[in-house]
Every structure is written in C-alpha cells, then in structure tokens.
C-alpha cells in the first residue's frame, strides 16, 4: 500500500471490475467510441485512479461536469481527450484552451461571448460539442435555426473545431420512455447541418436498451462502475455488470446494553431486552446517512440491525454476543444480490444508486485493486 489511513473505515474500489464493464460496452458497441463519464470524482470512487487504469487498457476519451474536474485530471497526467458536459464560464475559456479541454456549447449567446474571450493571437484549437435539448429541459438549444447559426459561427473561426453534437435522454431508464421520440428529434436536427466527428446521445440506459446506430459514440456513466440505471433496465437486459465499490468499517467497541437503556441522539432506541451492541467509526459525514437507521449491515457474516440515530462520525449496531472488537463490517457490498448492495442502500434512503455513490465522502480512504495490486489513496493526507 502506498499511503496510510488511521481509521478503521474505508472504501474498496475494484478497478478491474470497472475495466471489465468498460470492455463489455466496448464489445456491445464495437463501432463506437466509449466516452467514460468520470464526473463527480468518478461517481464517488476516484476519477484520477479510474482514468489512469482505463487509459492503461486503451481508453481515449473521458467526460466530466466541470472545468475544474478536467484540470484535476490533467494535473495528474491524464492526457486523453476530455469533454466538459456542463457550462463553463466564458471568462475561463483560456484555461480550457491551455489544458486542451473540449467544451459544451449550450447556446448561440454563450458561443458569441466565448469568441470575444479568445485572444487575437491564439494559435491553439478549442474543441466544441454542441448540446441539443430534445426533451431534457436543461442546457442546450431547442431551435434548429440556432443550431445552424452556431455551427456556422464555429466553422468561420480559425482554431474553433466543431468536434461533436449531443443530447441527453430524460427517461431512458423507465418503461414507456420518451427516449425514441428524443432520438428521432435528435437525428432530424443533426441531419440539418454537416456532421461533426462525434455524435452521441446514449447514456448508460440508452447504451443498454437501444442500438443507436445513428451515433458513433456513447457516454458510459453509472454502468461503467457496475450498476444498472434502474431496476427496469436490469430486468430488461442480458448484459452482466460487475459492481466495483464496497464500503467497509470495523467494530471499535463492543458492550452490553441493559433493558431500558438507550443509544445515540434523541434516545430513539430503547432496549427491550439485554443485548450486545457494537460501535462503528463511520457516520453520515462519510455518506452513510441518518436514513439508514433500521437498516442491516454484515458483521463478519451476520446480518445486524443499525440502531439509534446515525451520528456524524459514529453509529451503533445490534450484534450477536460472540462479536468482538476489530471485526469487519460491510455497509455497502459489491455484489448485486447482497442485502447490502448499492441498490438496497438506495432503497432504504429513498433515492437512487447514483446518489449513494456520489455521497461517499472524500475523507473515506480508497483502496484500489487492479492487476493483482493494492493501492491506497487518502485524500486527507495529500
């Protein structure tokens, strides 16, 4: 291990599982470029390590949400193509050019202001992907005339490159989806002007559920990490994904709770019998939220209930009497059918697996497993 950590709580990340998922989609869409979406710190798992591992195995294109995320990757030696999916402030355009980062064009107004910000003596290219709003209702242009004007403006300027056009599906992971309607509209709009190098509209759900031959690239997000976008998608595809993250802690104290005694804030749990409890050094500041009270965790093979309110840094679990200090506890597992799967955690929290992963705090050390290696990253000690 290259770094250390000083708390018995950590996140296991299997980079080989992520690579297997990437290769799976590479085969599924063999005639397309796979754009690996590693925004939000690689959905909480670590964008730098993920990018570095995928690049070692042939990945050439990544997408992030912000220019800051792109620059972070460049600072860590990621020299692959990078696309920022969000809107970059026009006053920061020179930074994008400096770091060779492709940007999203959300509107004609943004593009005109961007052109003003580019120095007259600039000799470096700025790659642009035009965003079309076909039904998501977020950034992007809905008007075909605006799209034509934007492409024309790009083509008239030296060092501006019309590299891509894309849209985003609003409900590709749901039954009775409007995905096909959006796809049809996207094709109609794109066909009105010359086609750029990259045409992409499929997210993870779209990549699993539709062929999308009009496009020559896909954006692989949640499924890159081994998770299905929804139960509907999981039930309607035959593609096997490998979940890559496991949240682990350890019992740091074991004690007996007598009848009538309480635990944690608000005294919401009152013992109705004598029982053994264990304290874990993990809390909602790590991403294991208060709504997980009443959930079950795996304490060395035993399913044990979370009792009392989860604190910022600690939580309490009811355990069998044989449990001792120092025993391993799995709070989120890397198996689809586990009672502690990311989906099970999401259901308990009343949310989706995306949010569960993204909530994983930076203070959690990440232990990366790849090519028979084990490497620790501790953001707090950098």
Curated annotation (Swiss-Prot):
Belongs to the alanine racemase family. It comes from Staphylococcus epidermidis (strain ATCC 35984 / DSM 28319 / BCRC 17069 / CCUG 31568 / BM 3577 / RP62A). The modification N6-(pyridoxal phosphate)lysine is found at residue 39. The keyword Isomerase applies. The keyword Isomerase applies. The active site is at 39 (proton acceptor), 265 (proton acceptor). The gene is alr. GO terms for biological process: D-alanine biosynthetic process; peptidoglycan biosynthetic process. Transmembrane segments: none annotated. The lineage of its organism: Bacteria, Bacillati, Bacillota, Bacilli, Bacillales. Its EC number is 5.1.1.1. GO terms for cellular component: cytosol. It catalyses: L-alanine = D-alanine. It is an enzyme of class 5 (isomerase). Its cofactor is pyridoxal 5'-phosphate. Substrate binds at residues 138, 312. Catalyzes the interconversion of L-alanine and D-alanine. May also act on other amino acids. Keywords: Isomerase, Pyridoxal phosphate. NCBIfam families: alr. Pfam families: Ala_racemase_C, Ala_racemase_N. Pathway: Amino-acid biosynthesis; D-alanine biosynthesis; D-alanine from L-alanine: step 1/1. PANTHER family: ALANINE RACEMASE, ALANINE RACEMASE, CATABOLIC-RELATED. GO terms for molecular function: alanine racemase activity; pyridoxal phosphate binding. This is Alanine racemase.
């Amino acid at each position: 291990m290259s770094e250390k950590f000083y708390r018995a709580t950590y996140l296991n990340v299997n980079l080989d599982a992520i690579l297997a998922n990437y290769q799976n989609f590479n085969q599924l869409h063999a005639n397309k470029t796979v754009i690996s979406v590693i925004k939000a710190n690689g959905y909480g798992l670590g964008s730098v390590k993920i990018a570095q591992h995928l690049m070692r195995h042939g990945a050439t294109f990544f997408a992030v949400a912000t220019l800051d995320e792109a620059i972070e990757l460049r600072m860590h030696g990621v020299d692959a193509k990078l696309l920022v999916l969000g809107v970059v402030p026009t006053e920061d355009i020179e930074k994008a050019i400096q770091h060779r980062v492709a940007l999203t064009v959300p509107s004609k107004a943004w593009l005109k202001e961007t052109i003003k910000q580019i120095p007259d003596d600039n000799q470096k290219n700025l790659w642009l992907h035009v965003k079309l709003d076909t039904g998501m209702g977020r950034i992007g242009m809905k008007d075909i005339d605006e799209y034509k004007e934007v492409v024309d403006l790009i083509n008239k300027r030296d060092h501006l490159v019309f590299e891509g056009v894309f849209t985003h599906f609003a409900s590709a992971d749901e039954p009775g989806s409007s995905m096909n309607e959006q796809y049809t509209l996207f094709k109609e709009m794109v066909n009105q002007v010359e086609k750029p190098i990259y045409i992409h509209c499929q997210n993870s759900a779209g990549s699993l559920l539709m062929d999308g031959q009009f496009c020559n690239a896909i954006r692989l997000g949640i499924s890159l990490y081994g998770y299905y976008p929804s139960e509907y998608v999981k039930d309607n595809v035959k593609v096997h994904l490998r979940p890559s993250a496991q949240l682990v802690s350890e019992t740091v104290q074991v004690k007996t709770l007598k009848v009538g005694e309480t635990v944690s804030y608000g005294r919401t749990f009152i013992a109705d019998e004598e029982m053994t409890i264990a304290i874990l050094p993990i809390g909602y500041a790590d991403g294991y939220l208060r709504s997980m009270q009443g959930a079950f965790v795996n304490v060395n093979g035993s399913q044990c209930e979370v009792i009392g309110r989860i604190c910022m840094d600690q939580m309490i679990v009811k355990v069998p009497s044989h449990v001792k200090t120092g025993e391993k506890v799995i709070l989120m597992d890397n198996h689809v059918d586990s009672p502690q799967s990311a989906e099970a955690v999401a259901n308990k929290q009343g949310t989706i697996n995306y949010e569960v992963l993204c909530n994983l705090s930076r203070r959690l050390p990440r232990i990366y497993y790849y090519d028979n290696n084990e490497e620790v990253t501790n953001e707090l000690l950098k």
